[in-house]
Structures are given as structure tokens and as C-alpha cells.
UniProtKB/Swiss-Prot annotation:
It comes from Cryptococcus neoformans var. neoformans serotype D (strain JEC21 / ATCC MYA-565) (Filobasidiella neoformans). It comes from the Eukaryota. One of its GO terms (cellular component) is nucleus. This is tRNA (adenine(58)-N(1))-methyltransferase catalytic subunit TRM61. Residues 394-409 have a biased composition (Basic and acidic residues). The lineage of its organism: Eukaryota, Fungi, Dikarya, Basidiomycota, Agaricomycotina.
Length: 433
């Protein structure tokens, strides 16, 4: 088996046999293998591979005359490979990949399962995340895609990826054991979840993620996860909003200095405080006047009836309110904001074309068996303490994803690995920490 040098490296200069990314535009990239004697052609020009050997990664390479084009030669990364790989299936992009990697807790030296290799976009990212000491076990049921992916992984030097041709929904994950995380990109992930439980580690908290484009798939997946003992089930959709930067014209000062902006903010805060004090003062004066009017109304007037007193009250109230009305322009002097002299400049605008919905990501956590048994025992005891004279509706199997409201899972989640090991070794069923 011919395994080439690793695809992901930190070398400075381009060498023969390297895989490089030719960057033409943000949505136009091509991956090539540097082979002496060959030439890359595109609408911008021609680029002999011999001309690229020895150049620094990131260099701007111009096409020989008469073509005026140029390309940037970039060092490959999983992110760039995702944007330039040959599509054999629908692939995952960086927003989903990064979120899945974070939620699964993929770490250096870890062991993860990927079911549904496809074009290998997720596989390359997982390979980099686990590092040389970790392992990615990837499964693909389609024979032709499996063979193509196997050759690709070998040529890219992904020695920590173990690819197998297997239908995991029917045959399971084989001898895979001690796995910390599982990612299922399958049409029917609920058929593979029972097999995934057998491959997960039983002594630590493990996680699973299911990638499904339709809500009907999500509902079936959630039902299966609950039946298999998973907790903290949640579903998210990751959307990205692309913005384009607008370059201001040259030799212009559209942006103010930091000192001027800081000075403006300080003056604004000072005016806001003065306005607040003025409002407090005005409110106190109004309350004092209202109390004075009420006190005058309470004094009995000789020879006058109460109805006559009420008829005269509007004229008195109007004369009292005239003074604040006349003095309002004076108080408004502190309320008036000075005109904003800062120029308004557009520096960014939303891209006219952006990717929309890809799929729904359903995550769940599987606690160690001893923890789950203690949680079930505590739930049972709490049910026994519940008064029996309350008539409850029969429980139904709901497919709505919800979150635990109890404090037990929160306590377990707050444990460190050492506290978790000590608690499990003690054999205690009490979760009071």
C-alpha cells in the first residue's frame, strides 16, 4: 500500500508530490498534486508545475505571457479541502463540521466513529482533530464510494483513519470498541443507534450526533435515542450569514480615530447622566405640586359647595401647569442631543447569495451505566413519594425534544473527571455533591 506524505503539514516551500490548493476566488478553488512536467490550465492562464516547485505557500503566481491571470497557491487544510474536493455525495461544510466537533468533544488521542463516509469532508476534519495518536473509524456501505475514498485517504496520508465497507444499520460496527463519540450521516440513523451503543465506552460520558435533512427523520431518531437510554437530547440547525467587505476609496479618512470616538462616548454618557438627574428633579417638583393641589382641595371653603369648588379647580390647575410649560424650553436644553457629525460609511453588506438549510443536527449524551441506574432509582423513589390521590393522564410516547429540569444531571455535568471516577468507585447511589 503506497502511502504518501501527510496532506496536512507546516512546510514553508512547495515540493514535488505535495497537494496544493489553487485559489482563484472565494467560491473557485482547485486541489492539484504537484507533478514535475505537468501543467494546470484554466481560463486565467496556464501554470506549469515546475514553476510552482520551490515557491512559498501563499504566493501569488502569475501565468506566463500572453495570459494575464494569476492564482494563489495555498497549503491544504481541512477547511480548504472541503471547498475544493470532488463531490461524490452531498457534503458537510465548515459551520456544521466545527459545531459537531465541539459538541462531540473530539479531542487529540480520542476515538470516534463516522458512519457515512461519502466524499470524506468530515473525515479529513476528524482526522486532524484526533491527531496521530487518535483514531477515526469510518464506515461506507456503497462499494464504489468506499474504494474511491480508500485510495484518497491513502494518497493524503491519513494513517489514523480506518475505513471499512459495511452496512452499519444491519451489520453493526464490527469490532469497534472504546469509542468516545459517534457521528451518523445516514438515511435511517435510528437503525444504527442500537449498534452504536455497543461501541461506546461505558466508563465515561459519551456523545452521539445524527445528521438528518428532514424533521421526520429527527422525530424517529429522538424516539430511538430515548429508548436506548440517551439523555440531554437536543436538535440544532446551523446557518451562516456571509458579509462582503466594502473597501473605501483611497486617500480618504472615512473612519474616525479611536480617541475621537472615545471622547464622543464620554460626552454622551455625561449628557445621559445630566438628563437622568433632570428627570428626577422634574418628577419631584411635579409630585410636590400635585400634593399641594390635593391639600388645597382638602381645605373646606366657607359658603361654597363642593360642586362649585370642583368647577373652579380646572382654572387653578391650568394656572399651575402654565409655569412648567413655559419653562420647558429651558429644560430641553439638556435633553437635546448635539447633531452627529460622524460620517456614515457602509463597510460591509450581506452577500446576495448564501447557503441555506443543510440538515438538522441531533445531539445526545449517554451516561455510564452506574449513573443511569442511580438516576432511575432516584426517579422511582420520587414517584413513590408522590401523592396517589392525584389523577394523572396516561403517559404517551412523545417525540418532542426536551431538556432535563432536574438537578441530578446538572450535578453530574459539573463533575470533573476525577470526581466522576471517585463517585463511581464509591458505589454510592446518592448524587449529593
Amino acid at each position: 500500500m503506497d502511502i504518501r506524505k501527510p496532506m496536512f503539514h507546516s512546510r514553508v516551500h512547495i515540493e514535488a508530490g505535495d497537494i496544493v490548493i489553487l485559489y482563484m476566488a472565494r467560491d473557485n478553488m482547485t486541489a492539484i498534486t504537484i507533478t514535475p512536467g505537468e501543467t494546470f490550465h484554466n481560463k486565467y492562464g496556464r501554470y506549469p508545475h515546475d514553476m510552482l516547485i520551490g515557491q512559498k505557500y501563499g504566493s501569488k503566481i502569475h501565468s506566463p505571457p500572453p495570459h494575464p491571470g494569476y492564482v494563489h497557491v495555498l497549503r491544504p487544510t481541512p477547511e480548504l479541502w472541503t471547498l475544493s474536493l470532488p463531490h461524490r455525495t452531498q457534503i458537510l461544510y465548515l459551520p456544521d463540521i466545527s459545531y459537531i466537533t465541539m459538541r462531540l468533544g473530539v479531542r487529540v488521542g480520542g476515538k470516534v466513529i463516522e458512519a457515512g463516509t461519502g466524499s470524506g469532508s468530515m473525515t479529513h476534519s476528524l482526522s486532524r482533530s484526533v491527531g496521530p495518536s487518535g483514531q477515526v473509524m469510518s464506515f461506507e456501505y456503497h462499494r464504489q464510494r468506499f474504494e474511491t475514498a480508500l485510495k484518497e485517504f491513502e494518497s493524503h496520508g491519513l494513517t489514523n483513519v480506518r475505513l471499512q465497507h459495511r452496512n452499519v444499520c444491519k451489520e453493526g460496527f464490527g469490532d469497534a470498541q472504546g469509542v468516545e463519540g459517534v457521528f451518523l450521516d445516514l438515511p435511517a440513523p435510528w437503525e444504527a443507534i442500537p449498534h452504536a451503543v455497543k461501541a461506546l465506552r461505558r466508563d465515561i460520558i459519551t456523545r452521539i450526533c445524527c445528521f438528518s435533512p428532514c424533521l421526520e427523520q429527527v422525530l424517529k431518531t429522538v424516539t430511538c435515542l430515548r429508548s436506548e437510554g440517551f439523555s440531554d437530547i437536543s436538535t440544532q440547525e446551523v446557518l451562516i450569514r456571509t458579509h462582503e467587505l466594502v473597501t473605501p476609496p483611497p486617500n480618504t479618512t472615512y473612519l474616525s480615530s479611536i480617541s475621537s470616538v472615545v471622547s464622543y462616548l464620554r460626552e454622551h454618557e455625561q449628557r445621559k447622566e445630566e438628563r437622568r438627574l433632570l428627570q428626577i428633579k422634574t418628577a419631584k417638583e411635579n409630585n410636590r405640586k400635585v400634593k399641594g393641589i390635593e391639600a388645597d382641595d382638602a381645605i373646606p371653603v366657607e359658603g361654597e359647595t363642593g360642586s362649585k369648588r370642583k368647577l373652579e379647580q380646572p382654572s387653578v390647575t391650568g394656572s399651575d401647569n402654565a409655569a412648567p410649560a413655559n419653562s420647558r424650553p429651558k429644560t430641553n436644553l439638556l435633553w437635546t442631543e448635539p447633531p452627529n457629525t460622524l460620517p456614515s460609511t457602509v463597510l460591509t453588506k450581506p452577500s446576495p447569495e448564501m447557503k441555506g438549510h443543510t440538515s438538522y443536527l441531533t445531539f445526545a449524551i449517554l451516561y455510564p451505566e452506574s449513573v443511569r441506574l442511580s438516576m432511575v432509582a432516584q426517579e422511582t423513589s420520587s414517584r413513590v413519594e408522590t401523592p396517589t390521590n392525584i389523577t394523572k393522564a396516561p403517559e404517551t410516547h412523545s417525540q418532542e425534544t426536551h431538556y432535563s429540569e432536574g438537578s441530578e444531571i446538572e450535578k453530574i455535568g459539573a463533575m470533573t473527571s476525577k470526581e466522576m471516577d471517585d463517585w463511581m468507585k464509591s458505589g454510592s447511589t446518592s448524587l449529593s455533591i
